[in-house]
A protein has these predicted regions:
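Conserved beta/loop motifs at nucleotide-recognition and modification sites
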Residues: 1-162
Length: 162
């Protein structure tokens, strides 16, 4: 579920793929699952924001390139990145006010698993830094929609600026 998201149909398909991959093998390990399972777009974006947070910009750029090869549009990717940072911001504020993960999920109407992932990430950010990133997202969105520059390049420059 961590790799595929919470869509039951996708989870079911991925389990079927694992069973076919295993054949007669009685056990499976984490490495097998990571190699076989396709990460959801949402999981890729969480991974992307994790790379950014850790300063692993090369990995972040490579993931952007991979997603674009898979026909994901830079504007869509930025929208998802922005959504993640807004979620981080909301989680940071509400957790400071003493809300639990479940309360946060209910308050902002987000799946509890997304909130759990976000709460693990927000520990590494100050509120002002999150606001700065959200502002940079808005500026990049404007550039993507109004500039004649290559959209992938604009997105990569955004990642490098964080």
């Amino acid at each position: 579920i961590e790799l595929t998201g919470i869509n039951f149909n996708i989870v079911s398909q991925e389990i079927e793929k694992i069973i076919l991959f295993l054949g007669e093998r009685p056990t499976i390990n984490k490495k097998d699952v990571e190699e076989i399972i396709n990460r959801s777009l949402e999981q890729n974006v969480f991974l992307l924001t994790e790379y950014i947070q850790k300063g692993e910009k090369y990995k972040a750029i490579q993931l952007i390139k991979d997603l674009i090869v898979m026909k994901e549009e830079p504007i869509k990717l930025l929208a998802l990145i922005t959504s993640n940072y807004r979620l981080y911001y909301q989680c940071k504020i509400l957790s400071r006010k003493g809300y639990s993960g479940q309360q946060i999920a209910k308050t902002i109407n987000v799946h509890p698993y997304r909130v759990k992932l976000a709460l693990n990430q927000v520990k590494h950010y100050q509120l002002t830094h999150l606001l700065n990133i959200i502002d940079q997202c808005a500026e990049t969105d404007y550039k993507l929609k109004s500039s004649y520059m290559d959209k992938q390049l604009i997105l990569e420059l955004f990642i490098l600026s964080l």
